[in-house]
Amino acid sequence: MRWIFHLGIALLLMTGCASYERQTAAFRGAWNAGNVQKASELANMQVYDKSDSHDGVIWLLEQGAALRANNQIKESIYAFERAEKRMRHYESQAKIRVSKEATALAVNLESVPYEGRGYDRVMLNTYQALNYLHLGQRDAAMVELRQASDEQDAELIRNARRISSARKSAGRYRSNILRTQNSAGTRNQLDSLQPSLNMDYGAFVNPFTDFLHALCLWSLADDQSENAIVSLRRIYQTLGQPRFIADEIKAVDKILSGGKHPDLTYVIFEIGVAPIRKEVRLDIPLFDQELPYVTAEFPRLENRGHPLTCAVVIGKNKIDAMVICEMDAVIGRDFQSELPGII
């Protein structure tokens, strides 16, 4: 029995700003051409030049993903470790970060360092788990998957904190801002920033990470099949009750009833590139005599590429892949949650 699914996930894990898009032209060209060796070499050079820049985190993440694609697993682990360390540093300076973001809205988003979004952290740990599985280090892989699960929960708290801080920073303009938000013209402008989602997995949920964690729980960890089946049932509902998850649940049920572990082959397709953040200049009325309006750069997601169908052919048998995660949807949901704080 074989299961094939594809993950609408990108080598470009992050959604950088306009300046980053310009910087990555050669890198993206190599990746889109399937030249992962060239892509990893370009990422290495960019990290050497820009590891301490505003785009340092994003380049370390790109480097880790490119090296992994080029089968340089140990080097990929090191790159991701550096990225994680940098993101933790930014997280420890949360109060400073909030003030910087508030100031940047009056200027432009390029002035703010890219510190990593919640989905970056989750995918970092997920890729690290895959790296360790590649090296046969099961315990290390389980640690990364548990951390990825914890990061999904932590992002709920981070987002609530961001929105609360943004509201406090509004200060005396709060009533004017509410009036602005309720005006028809402004509402139309702000609605144009909302991403279009084909799927909604819920706040800060990555179904692929959850599935991989459940898979490792029942196949690698001792006495974790019950936890795995709980996770699989949650994923089953999140994805709209797909057949392959239903069959996965049946397989784990058999194990819980004393059956043997089945011999399975899982084929994972990773396709596409992540959406990128564009800056849109909007003139927003504030209904204040001293500050009648403000011109600011607001972020808007722009999807890139289009979905592809994937399949595996074994002899005369063709097995079509099923989508388990669209990163466009994961990133778009995160973006939707972030917008109230920005606005």
Which residues does each PLM region occupy?
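Bacterial N-terminal signal peptides
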Residues: 6-15
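N-terminal amphipathic/basic membrane-interacting segments and domains
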Residues: 25-29, 60, 152, 158-213, ...
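Bacterial Sec signal peptide processing site at the extreme N-terminus
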Residues: 15-36, 45
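Amphipathic alpha-helical segments of tetratricopeptide repeats
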Residues: 44-48, 84-92, 149-152, 156-157, ...
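Start-of-helix signal in alpha-solenoid helical-repeat scaffolds, especially tetratricopeptide repeats
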Residues: 20-21, 54-58, 115-122, 200, ...
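Structural motif corresponding to the intra-repeat A-B loop/turn of tetratricopeptide repeats
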Residues: 33, 70, 135, 220-222
